[in-house]
C-alpha cells in the first residue's frame, strides 16, 4: 500500500497545477466615433469583475482582443478574433472569455464549428458569462445543448433583422 501512495504523490508533484492563460474577447459591431466605444469599456469592466470567480487556481490575463466596429457575422472580417485563434493554436492562450455568445458569434454555423470542433481540438476552455452561461472546462457537454443552439440562431436572426432594418431606413432617405 505504501508504494501506491508514493507513486500517487510522485505523480502529483510531477504535474503542476494548470495555469489558465486567458484571452478576453470583446466586440462591438458599430463604432460610436470615440477612440473606444462605451460598450467596449462596459464589456471590459464586466469581464474584469467576473473573471476571478471562474478560476480556482492560477490564471493570467494574457491579452485583450477587441474588435470595435466589426460585425460578428463573419470570422474573417475580425482581425482580433483571427489573432485570438492563432494565439490558441500557438499555445499562448488556453482560455477564452467573453461577455456572451453574441459578442463572439452572430453566425450559428461558425459558433457550432468553433465550440464543438476548435475548442476541444486545442484543449481550450471557453467561457461565456451570460445568455447562456458556458464553461467548457466545468461542463463540456453544454456546447451541445439546445439553449446554446437556439441562442446561436437567435443571434444570427438579430443580425439579419438589424441589417434589413438599416437597409430599409437608408432606402427611404
Protein language model features and the residues they cover:
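Short, structured surface patches at the beginning of a domain
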Residues: 1-172
Amino acid at each position: 500500500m505504501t508504494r501506491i501512495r508514493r507513486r500517487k504523490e510522485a505523480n502529483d508533484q510531477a504535474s503542476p497545477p494548470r495555469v489558465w492563460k486567458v484571452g478576453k474577447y470583446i466586440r462591438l459591431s458599430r463604432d460610436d466615433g470615440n477612440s473606444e466605444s462605451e460598450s467596449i469599456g462596459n464589456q471590459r469592466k464586466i469581464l474584469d469583475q467576473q473573471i476571478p470567480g471562474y478560476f480556482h487556481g492560477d490564471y493570467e490575463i494574457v491579452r485583450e482582443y477587441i474588435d470595435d466596429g466589426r460585425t460578428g457575422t463573419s470570422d474573417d472580417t475580425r482581425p482580433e478574433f483571427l489573432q485570438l485563434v492563432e494565439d490558441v493554436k500557438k499555445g499562448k492562450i488556453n482560455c477564452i472569455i467573453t461577455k456572451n455568445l453574441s459578442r463572439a458569434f452572430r453566425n450559428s454555423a461558425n459558433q457550432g464549428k468553433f465550440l464543438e470542433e476548435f475548442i476541444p481540438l486545442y484543449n481550450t476552455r471557453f467561457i461565456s458569462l451570460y445568455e447562456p452561461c458556458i464553461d467548457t472546462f466545468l461542463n463540456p457537454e453544454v456546447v451541445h445543448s439546445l439553449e446554446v443552439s437556439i441562442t446561436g440562431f437567435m443571434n444570427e436572426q438579430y443580425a439579419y433583422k438589424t441589417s434589413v432594418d438599416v437597409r430599409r431606413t437608408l432606402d427611404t432617405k
